[in-house]
Amino acid sequence: MITIYTAPSCTSCKKAKTWLSYHHIPFNERNLIADPLSTTEISQILQKCDDGVEGLISSRNRFVKTLGVDFEDISLSQAIKIISENPQIMRRPIIMDEKRLHVGYNEEEIRAFLPRTVRVLENGGARLRSAI
């Protein structure tokens, strides 16, 4: 089952939920602000994140700038603690299942959550349309 971590005012989160619903992909939603992640949950997400802490943090976020922390200069445990205490610094949405993780909304990349059969059918249709 897919879990999507969101924030109420996040436009990208709304787009991701709409996309998942449109494609009839069931998901559980968790509001990161109302129900912040534990340090254990953040660690589990980071294990799947190819870009490490930098892939999870929104560097343009005003809260990150206010903190004045250079995440490259601190330990992983310190970064996890800061993230757990300041969930608003995370990029959103965070979409994950048992195997995959995607941070942010990119319609092409989110397609990884479509079942393989659907991706193959849609790609075949796109190729056919481009050949015409």
From Swiss-Prot:
Pfam families linked to this entry: ArsC
Task: Check the UniProt entry and state the signal peptide residues, or none.
Answer: none
Q: Which UniProt keywords apply?
A: Cytoplasm, Disulfide bond, Redox-active center, Transcription, Transcription regulation
- Write out the annotated subcellular location: Cytoplasm
Tell me which Gene Ontology terms the entry assigns under biological process. negative regulation of DNA-templated transcription
Q: Describe its partners and assembly state.
A: Interacts with the C-terminal domain of the alpha subunit of the RNAP.
Q: What is this protein called?
A: Global transcriptional regulator Spx 2
Gene name, Swiss-Prot/TrEMBL? spx2
